[in-house]
C-alpha cells in the first residue's frame, strides 16, 4: 500500500512540559517562512498556543466542530493561520468521546499546504481526534530520565490508532527538546534515543534557551522575538528537516 502524503502533522506526547506547544508555534512560523501555507490548530483546552501567540478569541476549534466554516475562525499570525482554542473546548472533550474522526471530517477541505495539530498532553478524545486526522506525528521529548519509556508508550498508542482509526498515520520523527549539552544526562538521553529509535529521531535538537522560554509572554514566535537566537536557528533547521521528511513520503 502506498503511504499517504503527509499534510497534517500532529504534535503529541502524553507527558506535559516537553516543549510540544513551543514546537508547534515555532515550527509553524518557520514552515511559513519556507513558503508553505500553514494552519496551526490549538487542540489543548488550556489554549497555550493561542495565548502564546497573543491571540484572544471567542470562537475557534470548538465552533469548527459544531459546523462553522473554517475561514471565519482563523487568525493570521506571523505568516500562518491559527485556529484558536477557546474555553468551550473543555466541553468538546466529553462530546468527542464517541466521535474520534470528527476533526478529520471538519478539516476535510481546509485548503492549506500543511496543518499542525497541537494535541493536549494526555490521551483525551481531542488527542485521538488529532491522531485520526493526521498522516504524520512529531513526538517532542525532553532530554531527561524516563524519556525512552514515554516515547515507547506513545508509539504503542500510535499503533493502536493506525490499526483501528487511521491506517495512514506514521511517525514523522522524535524531537529532542530542552537539551543542555553541558550535562551528561542530556547527552546520555540523546544517545539512548538515537540507539533505540535510529533515524526516527530528528537530527535537529532544540536547546534550552531563555529567548525561547520568554517569547510566549510577548505573544510572539521565536522568529519574531529573537530571530538570531540558538532557539530560532534550531527551529529553522527543524522546519527544513520536517519538509525533507514530508517530501520523502
UniProtKB/Swiss-Prot annotation:
GO biological process, one term: chromosome segregation
Residues engaged in binding ADP: 17, 19-22, 207, 209
UniProt-listed Gene3D superfamilies: P-loop containing nucleotide triphosphate hydrolases
Residues at which ATP binds: 15-22, 207, 209
The reaction(s) this protein catalyses: ATP + H2O = ADP + phosphate + H(+)
Protein residues bound to Mg(2+): 21
Cross-referenced CDD domains: ParAB_family
Stated family: Belongs to the ParA family.
Protein name in the entry: Chromosome-partitioning ATPase Soj
Lineage: Bacteria, Thermotogati, Deinococcota, Deinococci, Thermales
